[in-house]
Amino acid sequence: MQQRVIVGMSGGVDSSVSAALLLQQGYQVEGLFMKNWEEDDGTEYCTAMEDLADAQAVADKIGIKLHTANFAMEYWDRVFEHFLAEYAAGRTPNPDILCNKEIKFRAFLDHAMTLGADFIATGHYARRAETAYNSKGEAYAPLLRGLDNNKDQTYFLHAVHGREINKTLFPVGEIEKPEVRRIAEELDLATAKKKDSTGICFIGERRFNDFLKQYLPAQPGKIVLDNGKEVGEHHGLMYYTLGQRGGIGLGGMKGASEGAWFVLHKDVANNRLVVGQGHDHPLMQSTQLWSEAIDWVAGEQNIPAEGLRCTAKTRYRQPDQACTVFIDENSEHGVRVEFDEPQRAVTPGQSVVFYSDEVCLGGGVIHHTNAPTPNFI
């Protein structure tokens, strides 16, 4: 009996080719287009209608049914409110990770099951191993890096539980991006030459600062140097991220050297932005970080007293960094991570993701690091 797969079709080339490949592999395939954001401002930036039209054109071309589902309420409750709270607290969140965990897998999978699906599928560049069982006897599928190292998306998928990975197929995870484009052109799919989306799912391509100030009032404050000297005004700490180069408004400052300016520290308590020159400024360097809650793909992870040796990324596409993970005795579910080498601009609110060779073990949101605090704070 044919197994039924519902593919999350975004109107992009990766999910389009995923659906086509699954058909070729003999599955009974249907598509589902998720609407996760209600356009509230009438700007030209929202591409949801265009994306739906592209998904429908591909579905028609390959001869499958396309369902639609509106998860905007779930998105607002489970993703967007957290996103705003993190920015309001001075951190820099990654909503795409939470969106994958709560919407693109959990809500989508639940909905697909009501439609009689055996599996869901997405266009992510990732792979899954055969079903395994954790110590509680729960079935899960280990998450593996995508074959295309340049496109691997496990960093964004680390918070998806292995029981959901166990019900998911990743057709393009086994091939490289140029081959995906070639297949789309060969099949004459409407999305073959469509450029990859780069914006946060609900912001699209619009200016981030303009979007954010619709929801959070800007709180301007002082810009200070690493010695505490005031040199200007910032527009609101939420608009800046640790390690950011440029966009600070200090170009050509009198008496300063020609070098680029970097965000070194966000003094949230006093609403001050600390800046300085030097790509590897000491205030940006850390060797340890703490995370208060980890999502392990297997639902658990044994961490011995001497620590778990693995590699980690603290941002997408960063080369793997060797580290040791310890249980944080001061937190119920947290960990402390010690890196073998100093790390630059590790940013609270972003995620640390752990790997053992090809296997993505899981990860969590960075709470704080041991980067030095400016001595005037």
From Swiss-Prot:
Active site: 99, 201
Region (Interaction with target base in tRNA): 94-96
GO cellular component: cytoplasm
Keyword Acetylation: no
Chief location of this protein within or outside the cell: cytoplasm
Site-annotated residues for Interaction with tRNA: 124, 350
Positions of region (Interaction with tRNA): 151-153, 315-316
Top-level class of the enzyme under EC nomenclature: transferase
GO molecular function annotations of the record: ATP binding; tRNA binding; tRNA-uridine 2-sulfurtransferase activity
EC number: 2.8.1.13
Amino-acid positions noted as binding ATP in the UniProt annotation, renumbered to this chain: 8-15, 34, 123
Recorded catalytic activity of this chain's protein: S-sulfanyl-L-cysteinyl-[protein] + uridine(34) in tRNA + AH2 + ATP = 2-thiouridine(34) in tRNA + L-cysteinyl-[protein] + A + AMP + diphosphate + H(+)
GO process annotations (BP): tRNA wobble position uridine thiolation
Record carries keyword Ribosomal protein: no
Disulphides: 99-201
Domain of life according to the entry: Bacteria
Localisation: Cytoplasm
Keywords: ATP-binding, Cytoplasm, Disulfide bond, Nucleotide-binding, RNA-binding, Transferase, tRNA processing, tRNA-binding
Protein family membership: Belongs to the MnmA/TRMU family.
Role noted for this protein: Catalyzes the 2-thiolation of uridine at the wobble position (U34) of tRNA, leading to the formation of s(2)U34.
Protein name, per record: tRNA-specific 2-thiouridylase MnmA
